Amino acid sequence: MKVAVVGATGLVGTRMLEVLAERNFPVTELLPVASAKSVGRKITFQGKEWTVVSAEDAIAARPDLALFSAGGSTSAELAPKFAEVGTRVVDNSSHWRMDPTKKLVVPEINGDVIEKDDMIIANPNCSTIQMLLPLWPLHKAYTIKRIVVSTYQSVTGTGYKAMDQMTAERAGGKWGEYPAVYPHPIDQNILPHIDSFLETGYTKEEMKMVNETHKIFADDSIGVSPTTVRVPVQGGHSESINLEFEKDFTLEDVRRIMEETPGVTLQDDPANNVYPMPLYAWGKND
């Protein structure tokens, strides 16, 4: 399969390539796409060197699949151009997610909604996917009425420049003396917002979790109350979730469902200090 990765030299694009390799995805030809300053660079994938190409060259090559992680404006401009030449696009940006003509998909939840003619498929926000994958089997069993969620999101969610900011701060850099992507220092600090605030008082990140949950679960009646927080962790988002169900349940059954859910690893033995932590979840696919 001929695969293009748009944003291949970025933090998420690099991780995409790692996962493709880990899962032995059938890539016969790789088209790493990046901005003009990176064109011509060499990257290694599955033991071979590949040359970074322009989007125009990648489109001309008519790949079978294009994975996008280069920001919303890039997706808005380039995804239709890939689709026009017969390339199926999976977009990691927020641009297409709430477009009523596009499917917003978590394969384990609603992969069956994808049809042959769906050439641009939206990938949900990272915090939404992380929340909904374990909640889907619980929703099917008990019908979720309300979700109250707080997220503790790594600086990696902002990219390389955020990691550089935290590294500079940990090295003793003084505020204003190093490039910063956050409005305040992040080391030894937390930022009580991710993305900008809206008139409602929620942030854009929080509203993504609300709107995307409704679209993926195909149920606008579910109450979603999110608080998203940036924490000084380099790799691995965490979430605390409180659920209200329509139907009766037992904790034993909830644990059993979690244990049986593909993609979920249950760590729930607080008496022995066993619980999920980003340090140990980083780099894992569950």
Could you describe each region identified by the protein language model?
Residues 224-286:
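C-terminal active-site/capping subdomain that shapes the small-molecule cofactor and substrate pocket
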Residues 36-38, 126-127, 151-158, 190-198, ...:
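Glycine-rich beta-alpha junction loops
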Residues 189-235, 240:
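Oxyanion-binding "anion nests"
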Residues 17, 210-214, 255, 259:
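Generic solvent-exposed, charged/amphipathic alpha-helical segments
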Residues 142, 217-218, 245, 262:
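A broad structural signal for alpha-helix termini and local helix breaks/kinks
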Residues 1-186, 221-223, 256, 268-284:
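N-terminal Rossmann-like NAD(P) cofactor-binding subdomain of oxidoreductases
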